[in-house]
Amino acid sequence: MADETKKTEAPAQQTSNLPATYASGLFSMGQAELLTFVVPLWAVLQGAEPAEIGILVGARSALTFFLAIHGGALMDRLGTRRVMLFFTAMTGLVAAAYPFLPWLPLMIVLQMLIGFASNMTWIGAQTMIALVTGGDAGRIGTFSFYSRIGTIFAPLLMGVLWDVAGPQISFLGITAWSSCMFFAVTRIENPQKADAVIGKVSWRDLLPKLSDYTGSLKLAVLPAVAFTLAISFTRHATNAAESSFLIVYLKELGYTGTLIGSLFSFAAIFNGLGSLGVRFLRGLSTAWLMIGFTASSILLLALTPLFGSMFFLLAASHSIRRLSEGIVQPLMFALQARAVPREVQGSIVGLRVTNNRLASIVTPVIMGYAVQWFGLANGFYVIGALLLAICAWLAISVAKFELDRI
């Protein structure tokens, strides 16, 4: 693995692009949190059943699952900045349409469109930081920290908007947030060489190509890539379970939108601190760090019903969970960025996001039916047991195949 890393080492960091790239991470992650917060509550207002909420949340990942690899390849081919600008504008426009289309089938369509567009902006931000830093874990940790600033303020903003102005204005808040991201991306100078991207774009350049998919899938044979894909799947399955029913569960306990938003914002601070703290973990096994902190994140989510009625314990548990996630993310990004050549950074991010979207599609549906069959509190226990079993399998694999050396 060390040989692979040396072989694909990137050129010097482009520090002039760092501030705007950090800002793109902030707004793209915050954008996702705004959608995570408002859509389940909007669905409850429309009278959706638990299984329907799970399907609605899962639909947000459907197009991304099929087209993330294509989107990453587009960034390699057309330029990351250009693709990010288009999908940032698309996210803002689709968000503004939600209040006018409150029927479940149309909401599913909107979820598919806005899920794809917002995920493409996040793919772009991840690709951009990999290009700008060359896979430096310290600077990627700083990028993750700034990304978490978006997750600190976005839920709080949405909670206040929901309580004070109502759901319609809340969706327009997403549009305003996307406008801020659009401006941030315009400040980034394209880090890709002019001869490495297509100048004039034709409609054929926009179509998915089989070679993009096969080329990306071949990257999964690299041990570093395969392991991080497995960790990323488990991590995103945990977040998908949280996105589906944690907010609904807290609302049922009587918490206001502002209080729920404050809980998420407070926990996001610890997520950012975890990302900044990665630089102090150098020399320790990356594989075991990822497994240990991913498992702790799953366990704390599964135990939510034990803390639900005690807000301060719930806040502490959720904050430690986010701290664990904050440590895992930059380790994962940096390991993958160093494992593949510079010219396919978009493709590797697209592959990782496809993997993540699979988790985001499957988990809400499974948890939706678990909640419907066993009750809301027991649903957390069921999904936690399943995800911890995956972590146990990963730990056995690391020990058996000595993957702790990657």
Label the model's feature ranges.
Residues 2-15, 190-228:
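Juxtamembrane intracellular "pre-TM" segments in multi-pass secondary transporters
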Residues 61-69, 151-152, 268-276, 360-361:
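Residue-level signature of mid-helix packing/kink "hotspots" within the transmembrane helices
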Residues 82-96, 175, 288-303:
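Structural signature of the two symmetry-related core transmembrane helices
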Residues 67-79, 162, 274-286, 371:
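Helix-to-loop junctions at the C-terminal end of transmembrane segments
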Residues 112-148:
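Cytoplasmic helix-loop-helix junction between adjacent transmembrane helices
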Residues 11-61, 224-253, 257-263:
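Helix-loop boundary and gating motifs at the non-cytosolic
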Residues 65-99:
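Conserved MFS/SLC helix-loop-helix module at the cytosolic interface between two early adjacent transmembrane helices
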Residues 287-332:
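C-terminal transmembrane helical hairpin of 12-TM major facilitator-type secondary transporters
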